[in-house]
Amino acid sequence: MQTPHVLFVCVENAGRSQIAEGFFREHANKFEVTSAGTEPKSELNPIVVKVMNEVGIDITNQKPKLLSNKMIQDSFRTINMGCMNKESCPSLFVNDVLDWNITDPKGKTIEEVRKIRDQIKFEVLSLIKKLEDDI
């Protein structure tokens, strides 16, 4: 049996979806994981990298990636982190998507990004439990 693949998507793939990918990789060994965006940035948000390091998860090797049809087709479950603009919203391109509607960390203070990180961690751990119960 092929390992189920989980895909986290947002617009820039520089913050929220990268946090989710980092937590998911750390806590879910029965699944593959990746993240992508419809308009990916060239690098990760440095504050996001910093707040993930604070909890012992190094995401410096993760890179923003362009969302592709293959990623969507290969995904067992796709999670949209939320949209900062409707024209580029990944949920427009994915039929079966779970939308978490999480605030974008772009331009936020480190304290605000920590709260976003913690919210994403809670959502990821809840998702892992549900997925493990389903397989």
Residue positions per predicted region:
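Mid-chain, well-packed structural core segment of small domains
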Residues: 64, 70-93
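Short glycine/proline-enriched coil/turn segments at helix->beta-strand junctions
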Residues: 28-32, 74, 92-96
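Structural signal for conserved beta-strand scaffold positions within catalytic alpha/beta enzyme cores
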Residues: 35, 80, 98-101
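Phosphate-binding/catalytic loops
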Residues: 86-135
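Alpha-helix boundary/capping detector
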Residues: 50, 78-79, 105, 123
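N-terminal/domain-start segments enriched in small and hydrophobic, helix-friendly residues
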Residues: 1, 8, 14, 73, ...
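Generic alpha-helical secondary structure signal
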Residues: 46, 73, 111-114
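Conserved active-site segments centered on acidic
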Residues: 1-69
